[in-house]
Amino acid sequence: MNPCNLASDPKDSLVRSRAAMPTPRPLHLRIKAAVGLGLVLAPLAASAAAPTQRLAPPAEHDLAAAAVVTSRIASTAPPGGPVSFTWPIDQASDDLVARPAPHSATTTGHAQTVDAAALRRGVPLAISSPGAFFKVSPAARDLRIITPDGHTLRPGAGLRPIGSDPLAFTLDPAAGTGLFTLRAEADAPIHIDVLERGSEFVLLVQAARDVVFVGEQIHLEARLLHRGRPVPVERLHARLVAPNGHTLTRSLARQRDGGYVATLPVQGEPDARPWSIEVELDATVAGRTVRRTATTAVAVSAPTARLTGTAVVTHPGEGVRAEFALDVASDSRYALSAVLHGHNREGQLQPIAVSQSAAALTPGRRNLALEFDARLIADSGLRAPFELHDLRLVDQGRMFVLHRQARALALDR
């Protein structure tokens, strides 16, 4: 039997393979590289007599789908048979992150895009720290800035060029702070970036998660810090921008700790591209006008498959093999991975190895297995009881993260 040519139903493949073979032989092929890494073609079925174990309940920051949906986005995964890799972890160099930190943004500046008419009339720039840096897009001509006391600054006269860029300047620190006005000529919309380096006014923005499912909500937190302490703002809103350009705007509500929060519902058909969150605020602090804008991002997935919450665990040759049950809604190539942990002599958990497997799956109840070689476990010096951490399921054809669980399964031995 060629292990790469699998039928859509693993049980059918197993029946045909047994009928074709006059003598028993292993159901998988392991190819070991000289460096000790292994390539394992995924086994077709677990022993029917093996006990079924349940995954641990998802923790607060884990990602787990309650149901599956069919995606209208076609899978782009290239054709190929099932495959699995297992490799040991170098305890001295591997930096494992089972719970990736959500994307966040920290800024001391602001940005905006204005049309040519607004640029001719004058665009207000709130400067809260002397010597701010600013840059405009190349379409701007005859650039000038009016200071709060009415003086006009031009390139070379109050506007200090930065390097060879003719449209990047630093304001003369002697011009102070306040509401400046930028004027220029242009035939197209102009993007303006302002950065107040070293400012004591800092905007922090963070989503509660880096991945959410379509139909869920993004929980967003923002706060303006003045010398490290949160301060109130007059205007603060967030705009969720989908890859197709659709936007949703929400105001943020102040909390007792001085931060501001909002929930942004995620609707639409996601694809592999991230969704961006743009936050804008205006505030007056210690008599100074402060404007800040920040952009962060989240990934949005459609749960095209999910782990049902059960696994069949066996110990072939005293190694570890865990076969996970999946509920699949859309054709694609799916990948499963986890990190095996064992106990050292002090009774502390340490990582042993990473296992990954992938296969093209059709809708229905399917399985993916992870396997850890007995020699690999023995070489680690770690012992049972073992645990599987950082369990992840990914739709490779659509680049969707479908499951991520920091501590997934305590093995029976």
Per-segment meaning from a language model:
Residues 115-126, 152-179, 187-197, 270-271, ...:
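Beta-sandwich interaction modules
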Residues 136, 211-214, 225-235, 327-336, ...:
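A short beta-turn/strand-edge loop motif at beta-sheet boundaries
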Residues 156-170, 176, 254-266, 362-376:
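Aromatic sugar-binding surface patches on proteins
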Residues 192-206, 211, 285-311, 396-413:
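Short beta-strand elements
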Residues 215-228, 240, 322-325:
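Beta-strand-rich structural segments
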